[in-house]
From Swiss-Prot:
This is Ribonuclease J. Residues 1-29 are annotated as: Disordered. It is found in: Cytoplasm. Substrate binds at A259, S260, H261, H390, A391, S392, G393, H394. Belongs to the metallo-beta-lactamase superfamily. RNA-metabolizing metallo-beta-lactamase-like family. Bacterial RNase J subfamily. It comes from Thermus thermophilus (strain ATCC BAA-163 / DSM 7039 / HB27). GO terms for molecular function: 5'-3' RNA exonuclease activity; identical protein binding; RNA binding; RNA endonuclease activity; zinc ion binding. GO terms for biological process: rRNA processing. Pfam families: Lactamase_B_2, RMMBL, RNase_J_b_CASP, RNase_J_C. The gene is rnj. Homodimer. May be a subunit of the RNA degradosome. Its EC number is 3.1.-.-.
Amino acid sequence: MENQERKPRRRRRRRPQEGSQGGPQDHVEIIPLGGMGEIGKNITVFRFRDEIFVLDGGLAFPEEGMPGVDLLIPRVDYLIEHRHKIKAWVLTHGHEDHIGGLPFLLPMIFGKESPVPIYGARLTLGLLRGKLEEFGLRPGAFNLKEISPDDRIQVGRYFTLDLFRMTHSIPDNSGVVIRTPIGTIVHTGDFKLDPTPIDGKVSHLAKVAQAGAEGVLLLIADATNAERPGYTPSEMEIAKELDRVIGRAPGRVFVTTFASHIHRIQSVIWAAEKYGRKVAMEGRSMLKFSRIALELGYLKVKDRLYTLEEVKDLPDHQVLILATGSQGQPMSVLHRLAFEGHAKMAIKPGDTVILSSSPIPGNEEAVNRVINRLYALGAYVLYPPTYKVHASGHASQEELKLILNLTTPRFFLPWHGEVRHQMNFKWLAESMSRPPEKTLIGENGAVYRLTRETFEKVGEVPHGVLYVDGLGVGDITEEILADRRHMAEEGLVVITALAGEDPVVEVVSRGFVKAGERLLGEVRRMALEALKNGVREKKPLERIRDDIYYPVKKFLKKATGRDPMILPVVIEG
């Protein structure tokens, strides 16, 4: 028995934990469902084996050619299918393009409640709670977990997240160091490297440098301003310029900026208080964001905020009004003031209007229309770049170079930008001697597989956009949008035909050329002839409808050069 060979005991294979190494076939899948090749709808899925965490869940705003559409949100079929694998949802900050989609996405994926932890900083969760309540959801039904912008989170068995504070155009903004069994990923989140932020809280680059020293497998970084050379101006520079122009304004001052730009609003309030002006706010989103920021201590006022009614009878030099409308939105306060449609107040000569913002791509014409109207009403209008009253919240080229140098990643994925921004970031990296093949240009819906040695696109998941129209989500198709554009551009002609013993036709046009009685009379005659023939020959209603549609379409095109939407409605009498 003593000489009998002993069999080695089989050891149980341990699952990889934080800092441990996965097997040679292990990989992380990175799946952007929004935010690649576009501005907005930011949401990214990270998966290792059977565990997922999601980063952000944003929305986008409709472009000019999307009539009737209120919001755009990303399709999340993949997350609905794999909901049981989701271990956490992590929010980098409270901007709409990062959390605005959650009141729609959370019920789609989880229903009206979920135990999955949703991590966010204090202001971020404060804004999210307000959004959930606004859409009839109970914040308490979702597992909202407050963290600081520099916390560590253990997500499931495989992901350890070290958040790091990054300056941006909203407080409590973070990037994330993602430690996985195969290596480290650094995600910058939205950022700029502001040396003198309004709240004094600078970017925590020590964590970025530490990750770089340990070795970064993949860098995912903000490409928004990759075309801009130099550095993005500090928010404190903008505060000084706002102080200067508000101090010199002779009459009332109106300021518009993004409602979520708490630091900019704080700068305006400081200047108003310095020069003895009472601050009133007008506009739903401005009031909502500021109320939450005040309650949570992110916005400070010496006195209090006033209503329009309280300041309208004060001397002009004692009044400052913060208003919505930085993007020229038709129902915003500034737009209504510019077009003399505001019920409580009107622009008058001697007023100063400050646009402390820059137009989002696609909104330039709307903003210019508002500016021109304000000038026509006698206001002084101050806007960038003529006045230094706005700075971007995103890093320019020299700041992006610093992040690349601190992390020296093996692989690189430019994120948060249109294709031109991504490409310019790629070229910037190549100018620093990075191999071109180590950088991928991200696409929504792509599945990227990251191993210790490779980073490649290996497939796609269902992706795209859902249109939000009032209470409807996803029930607007591209075909419906095309119909709406057609009606908006060419107009509508409705032909109502009653098929019976005594056929009757009525014709109504909207948004079409000024159709005289002769033109509409000819349409009515053609439709009535087709209707009578159809009734006599006992044709199906669909066939009668076609017999009306095609001749009328051809006639109107020839007579007017226009191609209106023609809607024949044939009713059996």
